[in-house]
Design a protein with these regions (language model features):
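N-terminal secretory signal peptides that target proteins for export/translocation
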Residues: 1-2
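Bacterial N-terminal signal peptides
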Residues: 5-16
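Extracellular/secretory pathway-exposed regions associated with glycan biology
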Residues: 21-112, 116-216
């Protein structure tokens, strides 16, 4: 650490530089990583504990989650983190979260996504990698785009935090012809009547769900 600077001063500089990388987004509530209360319309995040010195996202299929959390949006700006996950684990470094969920597109077209994180993250839609922001790094934002048909689509955001103390995780979306805003599953809910649902991909929803009847 350079001499002559306090930790607080260095932290302020780091946060200022990090925020400068992010586009101006409309006001949105700051969220936590999630809560243990189940949200059937939100993102489910499975939490995994990592070995120290992990420098990339793990292969989740080889790990066992220690618990799950739920959230409708990921809007965690650069900050220090020591809270852990109440009700799941007190780990605040060397952990990963694998978020999975669905969202409904009413207006088909080219959608732009922005994923900012400290440390690594990736975005998949319908099992296609849209953004690769992996690795150990201070906050950085990466943009990706994908053409989406109308209907239900699968979304996955994988994230990991390496060494303490700072972290961040922000997912934003720009609908066709619009500016970026925080992605929220609450704004992409399907019609109330499942009979009216359409599917961008015939594998987007579990086939063992008796409430789902596919519309051709």
């Amino acid at each position: 650490m350079p001499t002559g600077y306090t930790l607080a001063a260095l932290c302020c500089v780091a946060l200022s530089l990090a925020r400068a990388q992010l586009p101006t987004l409309p006001d949105a509530p700051i969220t936590t990583f999630g809560v243990t209360v189940v949200d059937p319309f939100g993102l489910r995040g499975d939490i995994y504990l990592l070995r120290p010195e992990t420098n990339r996202l793990p292969k989740f299929e080889k790990l066992k989650p220690v618990g799950a959390i739920y959230t409708s949006a990921l809007n965690i700006p650069p900050r220090d983190f020591s809270d852990g996950f109440p009700g799941v684990t007190d780990r605040f470094e060397w952990f990963a979260i694998d978020y999975n969920g669905y969202f409904y597109v009413s207006n088909p077209g080219i959608y732009r996504f922005l994923l900012a994180s400290d440390d690594g993250s990736m975005l998949y839609i319908d099992d296609k990698r849209v953004i690769d922001n992996d690795g150990i790094h201070p906050i950085q934002a990466v943009e990706g785009r994908i053409t989406l048909s109308g209907g239900i689509h699968r979304i996955r955001i994988s994230y990991f935090q390496g060494p303490k103390v700072f972290l961040a995780l922000i997912l934003a979306v720009a609908r066709p012809g619009e500016n970026f805003r925080i992605f929220s599953t609450n704004e992409f809910r399907p019609p109330r009547n499942p009979a009216d649902w359409k599917y961008g991909d015939p594998t987007n929803l579990p086939t063992n769900d008796p409430a789902v009847k596919r519309k051709k």
